[in-house]
Amino acid sequence: MIPSKRILTDKDVKIWEESETREDILSFIESLAKAVEGFENDQVSEPVSDSVQSTIAVLTEIDKLIKLHPVIQDKNTSRFGKVEFRDFYDDVCEKADDLLSSHFPALTSEQIEQLSIYLQESWGNKRRIDYGSGHELNFICFLYGLTHYKIFDLQRDARNLVLVLFIEYLKIMREIETLYWLEPAGSHGVWGLDDYHFLPFLFGAFQLAPHKHLKPKSIHNEELVEMFADKYLYFGCIAFINSVKTSTSLRWHSPMLDDISGVKKWSKVAEGMIKMYKAEVLGKLPIMQHFYFSEFLVCPEGISEPRTHIHNGDEDDDQCCQDGAAHNTWGDCCGIKIPSLYAANAMEKQSHKPIPFD
């Protein structure tokens, strides 16, 4: 079967939420989170398996593709996403199958077909030039698929799937977001964790859960944030947000993170992150309507028939944000264009005038 999108209505979401497939992907995320509990970013599990190293090699090749597509058109004028991202995206799609077959020779052509779409869709949407938690979920599905096909062994590799692979993926995504000014897909704006990512906060909260000295309120201490930004994903995210949202304090530009900082224990934050991910990512139609079902992520019975599938990112998404999604409050996943942080900052530097963004 060719991976396809099937979640089109609120009824589909309800069926999905009660499905074994949704439970499988959530359990996978929880397993990864628990595997990094108490570990800093550089405390990888040694030795790093050949499978993890092969996946790093795939990510490295994708990172190299960015250099082949520098921003030229409207470099300093457009407030929205850079069209060169589409060339990068096309390059990833063109090379994805070969990358997987060369670095994972044990995979069959059918398995590569199943995995490839998740790898392609991990970097953002070609047509809209945006990125959000749904694309981040695709990368997790890619790792899940490699685990399903016995490339990864969770007992051996779980910690490194986060501390090696996810951290490398996040680094590449920050580069892509910064260079191509990707627009936030389905962002809550100031009422979200981050304009783009969710899982670094979830994994980061689990890392810190047993910490005896750092508290959730420590994110307001700039010295502590700077000191621990490279050690813990959560502090790294706070440092990154502070570096791009410089006009006001965290309390004003990220009130949800400010609210979370009032929680007494990181273990409670971690618990809350799982609940929030279930509700705000896996339970939202504007995100899950872009989710691909496949041979290893089986579509539950009763869900709508698949829409037309195109592998090159040019699908029109005619049904996007319709039926149930039009009445969902999560955000404009593919409607109103929202300029990225990077665009707003760059334009502000040029004009020396504040741009209303947050």
Swiss-Prot record:
Source organism: Candida glabrata (strain ATCC 2001 / BCRC 20586 / JCM 3761 / NBRC 0622 / NRRL Y-65 / CBS 138)
Cellular compartments annotated: Cytoplasm
Record-linked CDD domains: PTPA
Free-text function comment from the UniProt entry: PPIases accelerate the folding of proteins. It catalyzes the cis-trans isomerization of proline imidic peptide bonds in oligopeptides. Acts as a regulatory subunit for PP2A-like phosphatases modulating their activity or substrate specificity, probably by inducing a conformational change in the catalytic subunit, a direct target of the PPIase. Can reactivate inactive phosphatase PP2A-phosphatase methylesterase complexes (PP2Ai) in presence of ATP and Mg(2+) by dissociating the inactive form from the complex.
Record keyword Isomerase present: yes
Record field: catalytic activity: [protein]-peptidylproline (omega=180) = [protein]-peptidylproline (omega=0)
Listed name of the protein: Serine/threonine-protein phosphatase 2A activator 2
Enzyme Commission number, as recorded: 5.2.1.8
Keywords: Cytoplasm, Isomerase, Rotamase
UniProt entry tagged with the keyword Cytoplasm: yes
GO molecular function, one term: peptidyl-prolyl cis-trans isomerase activity
GO cellular component, one term: cytoplasm
Alphabetical list of Pfam families matching this protein: PTPA (PF03095)
Record GO biological process: mitotic spindle organization; response to osmotic stress
Encoding gene (name): RRD2
Name of the top EC class for this enzyme: isomerase
Record-stated family: Belongs to the PTPA-type PPIase family.
